[in-house]
Protein backbone atom coordinates (compact mmCIF):
# COMPACT_ATOMS: atom_id res chain seq x y z
CA UNK A 1 0.00 0.00 0.00
CA UNK A 2 1.37 3.45 -0.93
CA UNK A 3 2.06 6.25 1.56
CA UNK A 4 -0.89 8.22 0.21
CA UNK A 5 -3.23 5.33 0.88
CA UNK A 6 -1.88 4.85 4.42
CA UNK A 7 -2.66 8.48 5.28
CA UNK A 8 -6.32 8.19 4.28
CA UNK A 9 -8.14 7.52 7.53
CA UNK A 10 -11.87 7.24 7.97
CA UNK A 11 -12.58 10.98 8.11
CA UNK A 12 -10.34 11.77 5.13
CA UNK A 13 -12.00 9.07 3.06
CA UNK A 14 -15.42 10.34 4.06
CA UNK A 15 -14.44 13.92 3.19
CA UNK A 16 -13.19 12.89 -0.25
CA UNK A 17 -16.37 10.98 -1.04
CA UNK A 18 -18.55 13.77 0.40
CA UNK A 19 -16.91 16.38 -1.84
CA UNK A 20 -17.38 14.10 -4.83
CA UNK A 21 -21.00 13.54 -3.84
CA UNK A 22 -21.62 17.29 -3.59
CA UNK A 23 -20.32 17.77 -7.12
CA UNK A 24 -22.24 14.75 -8.41
CA UNK A 25 -25.51 16.00 -6.90
CA UNK A 26 -25.10 19.49 -8.36
CA UNK A 27 -24.34 17.98 -11.75
CA UNK A 28 -27.23 15.54 -11.31
CA UNK A 29 -29.60 18.43 -10.68
CA UNK A 30 -28.29 20.15 -13.81
CA UNK A 31 -29.04 16.87 -15.62
CA UNK A 32 -32.49 16.01 -14.30
CA UNK A 33 -34.04 19.48 -14.18
CA UNK A 34 -33.58 20.26 -17.92
CA UNK A 35 -34.30 16.61 -18.72
CA UNK A 36 -37.66 16.84 -16.96
CA UNK A 37 -38.34 20.16 -18.71
CA UNK A 38 -37.55 18.74 -22.17
CA UNK A 39 -39.12 15.27 -22.08
CA UNK A 40 -41.86 16.09 -19.54
CA UNK A 41 -43.24 14.08 -16.65
CA UNK A 42 -44.18 11.25 -19.04
CA UNK A 43 -40.65 10.87 -20.38
CA UNK A 44 -39.19 11.25 -16.91
CA UNK A 45 -41.50 8.47 -15.75
CA UNK A 46 -40.14 6.15 -18.49
CA UNK A 47 -36.60 7.12 -17.45
CA UNK A 48 -37.27 6.16 -13.83
CA UNK A 49 -39.09 2.95 -14.72
CA UNK A 50 -35.96 1.82 -16.56
CA UNK A 51 -33.91 2.73 -13.49
CA UNK A 52 -36.16 0.70 -11.18
CA UNK A 53 -35.63 -2.47 -13.23
CA UNK A 54 -31.94 -1.66 -13.59
CA UNK A 55 -31.62 -1.21 -9.82
CA UNK A 56 -33.05 -4.67 -9.15
CA UNK A 57 -30.45 -6.30 -11.40
CA UNK A 58 -27.77 -3.98 -10.03
CA UNK A 59 -28.58 -4.94 -6.45
CA UNK A 60 -28.37 -8.63 -7.34
CA UNK A 61 -25.04 -8.03 -9.10
CA UNK A 62 -23.29 -5.51 -6.88
CA UNK A 63 -25.06 -4.79 -3.57
CA UNK A 64 -23.25 -7.29 -1.37
CA UNK A 65 -20.10 -8.17 -3.29
CA UNK A 66 -18.34 -4.77 -3.06
CA UNK A 67 -18.96 -4.74 0.71
CA UNK A 68 -17.66 -8.31 1.04
CA UNK A 69 -14.69 -7.53 -1.18
CA UNK A 70 -13.92 -4.35 0.78
CA UNK A 71 -14.06 -6.20 4.12
CA UNK A 72 -11.88 -9.13 3.01
CA UNK A 73 -9.28 -6.89 1.34
CA UNK A 74 -9.22 -4.65 4.41
CA UNK A 75 -8.61 -7.67 6.65
CA UNK A 76 -5.82 -9.03 4.43
CA UNK A 77 -4.17 -5.60 3.98
CA UNK A 78 -4.17 -4.84 7.72
CA UNK A 79 -2.26 -8.11 8.27
CA UNK A 80 0.12 -7.49 5.34
CA UNK A 81 -1.21 -10.49 3.37
CA UNK A 82 -1.03 -8.99 -0.11
CA UNK A 83 -1.12 -12.33 -1.93
CA UNK A 84 -4.54 -12.84 -0.35
CA UNK A 85 -5.54 -9.35 -1.54
CA UNK A 86 -4.76 -10.48 -5.09
CA UNK A 87 -6.73 -13.68 -4.59
CA UNK A 88 -9.82 -11.85 -3.30
CA UNK A 89 -9.75 -9.47 -6.26
CA UNK A 90 -9.35 -12.32 -8.77
CA UNK A 91 -12.28 -14.32 -7.38
CA UNK A 92 -14.53 -11.25 -7.07
CA UNK A 93 -13.77 -10.24 -10.66
CA UNK A 94 -14.89 -13.64 -11.97
CA UNK A 95 -18.17 -13.48 -10.03
CA UNK A 96 -18.83 -9.87 -11.07
CA UNK A 97 -18.33 -10.61 -14.76
CA UNK A 98 -20.74 -13.56 -14.69
CA UNK A 99 -23.43 -11.51 -12.96
CA UNK A 100 -22.89 -8.45 -15.15
CA UNK A 101 -23.18 -10.35 -18.43
CA UNK A 102 -26.36 -12.08 -17.26
CA UNK A 103 -28.00 -8.83 -16.12
CA UNK A 104 -27.12 -6.92 -19.28
CA UNK A 105 -28.48 -9.72 -21.46
CA UNK A 106 -31.78 -9.77 -19.56
CA UNK A 107 -32.39 -6.00 -19.79
CA UNK A 108 -31.33 -5.64 -23.42
CA UNK A 109 -33.08 -8.67 -24.92
CA UNK A 110 -36.28 -8.60 -22.85
CA UNK A 111 -36.76 -4.81 -22.63
CA UNK A 112 -40.28 -4.86 -24.14
CA UNK A 113 -41.48 -7.61 -21.82
CA UNK A 114 -40.07 -5.79 -18.77
CA UNK A 115 -41.76 -2.53 -19.82
CA UNK A 116 -45.09 -4.29 -20.26
CA UNK A 117 -44.75 -5.89 -16.82
CA UNK A 118 -44.35 -2.42 -15.29
CA UNK A 119 -47.57 -1.22 -16.96
CA UNK A 120 -45.52 1.27 -19.02
CA UNK A 121 -44.99 -0.33 -22.46
CA UNK A 122 -43.46 2.85 -23.90
CA UNK A 123 -40.52 2.59 -21.48
CA UNK A 124 -38.92 -0.19 -23.58
CA UNK A 125 -36.33 2.07 -25.27
CA UNK A 126 -35.05 3.43 -21.96
CA UNK A 127 -34.83 -0.09 -20.49
CA UNK A 128 -32.96 -1.48 -23.50
CA UNK A 129 -30.45 1.40 -23.61
CA UNK A 130 -29.70 0.94 -19.91
CA UNK A 131 -28.94 -2.79 -20.28
CA UNK A 132 -25.16 -2.53 -20.97
CA UNK A 133 -24.73 -0.50 -17.77
CA UNK A 134 -25.22 -3.59 -15.60
CA UNK A 135 -22.01 -5.14 -16.96
CA UNK A 136 -20.12 -1.83 -16.83
CA UNK A 137 -21.14 -1.20 -13.22
CA UNK A 138 -20.02 -4.72 -12.27
CA UNK A 139 -16.61 -4.02 -13.80
CA UNK A 140 -16.39 -0.69 -11.96
CA UNK A 141 -17.41 -2.34 -8.68
CA UNK A 142 -14.41 -4.70 -8.77
CA UNK A 143 -12.07 -1.72 -8.97
CA UNK A 144 -13.95 0.35 -6.37
CA UNK A 145 -14.12 -2.59 -3.96
CA UNK A 146 -10.35 -3.05 -4.31
CA UNK A 147 -9.60 0.63 -3.58
CA UNK A 148 -12.13 0.95 -0.75
CA UNK A 149 -10.75 -2.16 0.93
CA UNK A 150 -7.38 -0.40 1.12
CA UNK A 151 -8.96 2.81 2.41
CA UNK A 152 -8.17 4.70 -0.80
CA UNK A 153 -11.31 6.67 -1.72
CA UNK A 154 -9.71 9.02 -4.27
CA UNK A 155 -10.24 6.90 -7.44
CA UNK A 156 -13.87 6.25 -6.48
CA UNK A 157 -14.45 9.97 -5.88
CA UNK A 158 -12.93 11.09 -9.17
CA UNK A 159 -14.74 8.39 -11.14
CA UNK A 160 -18.09 9.49 -9.68
CA UNK A 161 -17.58 13.09 -10.81
CA UNK A 162 -16.37 11.95 -14.23
CA UNK A 163 -19.44 9.74 -14.53
CA UNK A 164 -21.81 12.58 -13.63
CA UNK A 165 -20.28 15.08 -16.08
CA UNK A 166 -20.39 12.59 -18.97
CA UNK A 167 -23.99 11.66 -18.15
CA UNK A 168 -24.98 15.33 -18.16
CA UNK A 169 -23.44 16.17 -21.52
CA UNK A 170 -24.25 13.01 -23.48
CA UNK A 171 -27.67 12.44 -21.89
CA UNK A 172 -29.07 15.92 -22.47
CA UNK A 173 -27.70 16.16 -26.03
CA UNK A 174 -29.05 12.71 -26.95
CA UNK A 175 -32.47 13.27 -25.35
CA UNK A 176 -33.02 16.70 -26.90
CA UNK A 177 -31.67 15.56 -30.27
CA UNK A 178 -33.90 12.48 -30.46
CA UNK A 179 -36.95 14.45 -29.32
CA UNK A 180 -36.29 17.08 -31.99
CA UNK A 181 -35.71 14.66 -34.88
CA UNK A 182 -38.23 11.93 -34.00
CA UNK A 183 -40.81 13.69 -31.83
CA UNK A 184 -40.97 10.49 -29.74
CA UNK A 185 -40.96 10.83 -25.95
CA UNK A 186 -40.06 7.13 -25.40
CA UNK A 187 -37.05 7.45 -27.73
CA UNK A 188 -36.03 10.71 -26.03
CA UNK A 189 -36.09 8.90 -22.66
CA UNK A 190 -33.90 6.21 -24.25
CA UNK A 191 -31.52 8.95 -25.43
CA UNK A 192 -31.23 10.24 -21.87
CA UNK A 193 -30.25 6.73 -20.80
CA UNK A 194 -27.48 6.67 -23.44
CA UNK A 195 -25.76 9.31 -21.33
CA UNK A 196 -25.75 6.91 -18.38
CA UNK A 197 -24.23 4.13 -20.50
CA UNK A 198 -21.53 6.43 -21.90
CA UNK A 199 -20.67 7.73 -18.41
CA UNK A 200 -20.29 4.19 -17.03
CA UNK A 201 -17.97 3.25 -19.91
CA UNK A 202 -15.70 6.27 -19.39
CA UNK A 203 -15.63 5.79 -15.61
CA UNK A 204 -14.72 2.10 -16.03
CA UNK A 205 -11.80 3.03 -18.32
CA UNK A 206 -10.51 5.59 -15.78
CA UNK A 207 -10.77 3.14 -12.86
CA UNK A 208 -8.96 0.46 -14.86
CA UNK A 209 -6.03 2.84 -15.40
CA UNK A 210 -5.83 3.62 -11.67
CA UNK A 211 -6.20 -0.04 -10.75
CA UNK A 212 -3.34 -1.21 -13.00
CA UNK A 213 -0.87 1.11 -11.27
CA UNK A 214 -2.05 0.29 -7.75
CA UNK A 215 -2.28 -3.48 -8.29
CA UNK A 216 1.20 -3.57 -9.83
CA UNK A 217 2.64 -1.77 -6.78
CA UNK A 218 1.31 -4.27 -4.22
CA UNK A 219 4.22 -5.78 -2.24
CA UNK A 220 5.24 -9.36 -2.98
CA UNK A 221 4.71 -11.51 0.12
CA UNK A 222 5.26 -15.20 0.81
CA UNK A 223 2.14 -16.13 2.78
CA UNK A 224 -0.18 -18.83 1.45
CA UNK A 225 -3.59 -18.00 0.05
CA UNK A 226 -6.99 -19.62 0.33
CA UNK A 227 -8.32 -21.63 -2.62
CA UNK A 228 -10.69 -20.16 -5.21
CA UNK A 229 -13.60 -22.05 -3.65
CA UNK A 230 -12.79 -20.96 -0.08
CA UNK A 231 -12.40 -17.34 -1.13
CA UNK A 232 -15.65 -17.42 -3.11
CA UNK A 233 -17.42 -18.94 -0.10
CA UNK A 234 -16.04 -16.20 2.17
CA UNK A 235 -17.30 -13.53 -0.23
CA UNK A 236 -20.72 -15.15 -0.52
CA UNK A 237 -21.20 -15.53 3.24
CA UNK A 238 -20.87 -11.76 3.60
CA UNK A 239 -22.51 -10.77 0.31
CA UNK A 240 -25.64 -12.94 0.16
CA UNK A 241 -27.54 -11.45 3.17
CA UNK A 242 -26.79 -7.92 1.92
CA UNK A 243 -27.74 -8.81 -1.65
CA UNK A 244 -30.97 -10.52 -0.62
CA UNK A 245 -32.01 -7.48 1.40
CA UNK A 246 -31.08 -4.89 -1.23
CA UNK A 247 -32.51 -6.85 -4.15
CA UNK A 248 -35.63 -7.60 -2.14
CA UNK A 249 -36.21 -3.90 -1.51
CA UNK A 250 -35.71 -3.10 -5.19
CA UNK A 251 -38.15 -5.85 -6.19
CA UNK A 252 -40.64 -4.36 -3.74
CA UNK A 253 -40.07 -0.96 -5.40
CA UNK A 254 -40.83 -2.51 -8.79
CA UNK A 255 -43.99 -4.09 -7.39
CA UNK A 256 -44.88 -0.74 -5.84
CA UNK A 257 -44.70 0.91 -9.27
CA UNK A 258 -46.82 -1.83 -10.84
CA UNK A 259 -49.34 -1.58 -7.99
CA UNK A 260 -49.40 2.22 -8.09
CA UNK A 261 -49.92 2.38 -11.85
CA UNK A 262 -52.52 -0.41 -11.74
CA UNK A 263 -54.50 1.36 -9.02
CA UNK A 264 -54.47 4.69 -10.87
CA UNK A 265 -55.56 3.10 -14.15
CA UNK A 266 -58.24 1.16 -12.26
CA UNK A 267 -59.59 4.43 -10.83
CA UNK A 268 -60.17 5.69 -14.37
CA UNK A 269 -57.06 7.80 -14.99
CA UNK A 270 -55.72 7.78 -18.53
CA UNK A 271 -52.26 6.23 -19.14
CA UNK A 272 -50.76 9.68 -19.80
CA UNK A 273 -52.24 11.07 -16.56
CA UNK A 274 -50.96 8.13 -14.52
CA UNK A 275 -47.51 8.48 -16.13
CA UNK A 276 -47.48 12.19 -15.24
CA UNK A 277 -48.41 11.56 -11.60
CA UNK A 278 -45.72 8.92 -11.32
CA UNK A 279 -43.23 11.32 -12.90
CA UNK A 280 -43.98 13.92 -10.21
CA UNK A 281 -43.54 11.28 -7.50
CA UNK A 282 -40.22 10.23 -9.06
CA UNK A 283 -38.99 13.84 -9.05
CA UNK A 284 -39.78 14.27 -5.34
CA UNK A 285 -37.97 10.98 -4.69
CA UNK A 286 -34.95 12.40 -6.55
CA UNK A 287 -34.95 15.46 -4.27
CA UNK A 288 -35.39 13.22 -1.21
CA UNK A 289 -32.36 11.16 -2.25
CA UNK A 290 -30.06 14.20 -2.49
CA UNK A 291 -29.38 14.59 1.28
CA UNK A 292 -29.28 10.80 1.75
CA UNK A 293 -26.52 10.61 -0.85
CA UNK A 294 -24.25 12.53 1.55
CA UNK A 295 -24.66 9.70 4.07
CA UNK A 296 -23.40 7.11 1.57
CA UNK A 297 -19.74 8.30 1.81
CA UNK A 298 -19.91 7.64 5.54
CA UNK A 299 -21.21 4.10 5.03
CA UNK A 300 -18.59 3.33 2.38
CA UNK A 301 -15.74 4.61 4.55
CA UNK A 302 -16.67 3.04 7.88
CA UNK A 303 -16.91 -0.56 6.67
CA UNK A 304 -13.19 -1.03 5.84
CA UNK A 305 -12.17 1.26 8.72
CA UNK A 306 -14.10 -0.68 11.37
CA UNK A 307 -13.15 -4.03 9.82
CA UNK A 308 -9.43 -3.20 10.01
CA UNK A 309 -9.76 -2.05 13.64
CA UNK A 310 -11.67 -5.19 14.65
CA UNK A 311 -9.13 -7.39 12.85
CA UNK A 312 -6.37 -5.83 14.99
CA UNK A 313 -8.56 -6.19 18.14
CA UNK A 314 -8.83 -2.40 18.46
CA UNK A 315 -12.37 -2.28 19.87
CA UNK A 316 -11.92 1.25 21.22
CA UNK A 317 -10.93 2.57 17.79
CA UNK A 318 -13.90 0.83 16.18
CA UNK A 319 -16.27 2.37 18.74
CA UNK A 320 -14.83 5.85 18.17
CA UNK A 321 -15.28 5.47 14.41
CA UNK A 322 -18.90 4.42 14.92
CA UNK A 323 -19.59 7.39 17.19
CA UNK A 324 -18.01 9.80 14.71
CA UNK A 325 -20.16 8.36 11.93
CA UNK A 326 -23.32 8.79 14.03
CA UNK A 327 -22.50 12.42 14.86
CA UNK A 328 -21.76 13.34 11.24
CA UNK A 329 -24.97 11.62 10.14
CA UNK A 330 -27.04 13.69 12.57
CA UNK A 331 -25.35 16.94 11.54
CA UNK A 332 -26.20 16.27 7.89
CA UNK A 333 -29.64 14.69 8.08
CA UNK A 334 -31.50 16.82 10.63
CA UNK A 335 -31.14 20.24 8.94
CA UNK A 336 -31.90 18.67 5.55
CA UNK A 337 -35.02 16.97 6.87
CA UNK A 338 -36.56 20.06 8.45
CA UNK A 339 -35.41 22.30 5.61
CA UNK A 340 -37.05 20.22 2.88
CA UNK A 341 -40.24 19.70 4.90
CA UNK A 342 -40.68 23.43 5.62
CA UNK A 343 -39.53 24.68 2.19
CA UNK A 344 -41.22 21.94 0.17
CA UNK A 345 -43.11 24.30 -2.15
CA UNK A 346 -40.24 26.56 -3.29
CA UNK A 347 -37.84 23.61 -3.55
CA UNK A 348 -40.15 21.55 -5.79
CA UNK A 349 -41.04 24.64 -7.83
CA UNK A 350 -37.34 25.36 -8.42
CA UNK A 351 -36.03 21.84 -8.99
CA UNK A 352 -39.12 20.35 -10.64
CA UNK A 353 -40.34 23.41 -12.50
CA UNK A 354 -43.92 22.71 -11.35
CA UNK A 355 -46.85 25.12 -11.19
CA UNK A 356 -50.55 24.87 -10.35
CA UNK A 357 -51.93 21.43 -9.48
CA UNK A 358 -48.62 19.71 -10.22
CA UNK A 359 -46.86 21.97 -7.71
CA UNK A 360 -49.54 21.32 -5.08
CA UNK A 361 -49.12 17.54 -5.46
CA UNK A 362 -45.31 17.75 -5.43
CA UNK A 363 -45.40 19.96 -2.30
CA UNK A 364 -47.55 17.50 -0.36
CA UNK A 365 -45.28 14.61 -1.31
CA UNK A 366 -42.10 16.54 -0.47
CA UNK A 367 -43.36 17.63 2.95
CA UNK A 368 -43.90 14.02 4.01
CA UNK A 369 -40.66 12.78 2.44
CA UNK A 370 -38.65 15.57 4.08
CA UNK A 371 -39.16 14.26 7.61
CA UNK A 372 -38.30 10.73 6.45
CA UNK A 373 -34.72 11.80 5.64
CA UNK A 374 -33.61 11.51 9.29
CA UNK A 375 -34.90 7.97 9.64
CA UNK A 376 -33.41 6.88 6.33
CA UNK A 377 -30.01 8.28 7.32
CA UNK A 378 -30.04 6.35 10.61
CA UNK A 379 -30.93 3.13 8.76
CA UNK A 380 -28.07 3.60 6.28
CA UNK A 381 -25.37 4.16 8.90
CA UNK A 382 -26.48 1.53 11.41
CA UNK A 383 -26.75 -1.02 8.58
CA UNK A 384 -23.15 -0.28 7.52
CA UNK A 385 -21.92 -0.62 11.12
CA UNK A 386 -23.61 -4.01 11.48
CA UNK A 387 -22.16 -5.14 8.14
CA UNK A 388 -18.67 -4.19 9.36
CA UNK A 389 -19.28 -6.38 12.43
CA UNK A 390 -20.36 -9.27 10.19
CA UNK A 391 -24.02 -9.04 11.26
CA UNK A 392 -25.78 -8.27 8.00
CA UNK A 393 -28.85 -10.47 8.53
CA UNK A 394 -30.82 -8.41 11.05
CA UNK A 395 -30.97 -5.10 9.11
CA UNK A 396 -31.96 -7.06 6.00
CA UNK A 397 -34.97 -8.54 7.80
CA UNK A 398 -36.01 -5.17 9.24
CA UNK A 399 -35.76 -3.40 5.86
CA UNK A 400 -37.70 -6.19 4.16
CA UNK A 401 -40.53 -5.90 6.70
CA UNK A 402 -40.52 -2.13 6.18
CA UNK A 403 -40.78 -2.65 2.42
CA UNK A 404 -43.80 -4.93 2.84
CA UNK A 405 -45.45 -2.33 5.06
CA UNK A 406 -44.85 0.32 2.39
CA UNK A 407 -46.36 -1.94 -0.27
CA UNK A 408 -49.51 -2.40 1.82
CA UNK A 409 -49.75 1.36 2.40
CA UNK A 410 -49.45 2.08 -1.34
CA UNK A 411 -52.22 -0.40 -2.11
CA UNK A 412 -54.60 0.99 0.51
CA UNK A 413 -53.91 4.71 0.11
CA UNK A 414 -53.72 4.77 -3.70
CA UNK A 415 -56.99 2.87 -3.96
CA UNK A 416 -58.70 5.39 -1.63
CA UNK A 417 -57.50 8.85 -2.76
Where in the sequence are the language-model features?
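Hydrophobic alpha-helical transmembrane bundles that constitute the permease/transmembrane domains
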Residues: 18-30, 56, 60-68, 101-105, ...
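Membrane-interface junctions at transmembrane-helix termini in multi-pass inner-membrane proteins
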Residues: 137-159, 371-401, 411
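Interfacial/gating helices of multi-pass transporter permease domains
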Residues: 35-56, 185, 189-190, 233-238, ...
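Membrane-interface helix-loop junctions in multi-pass transport and translocation proteins
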Residues: 154, 165-204, 393, 403-417
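Helix-loop junctions and terminal segments of transmembrane helices
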Residues: 63-78, 292-316
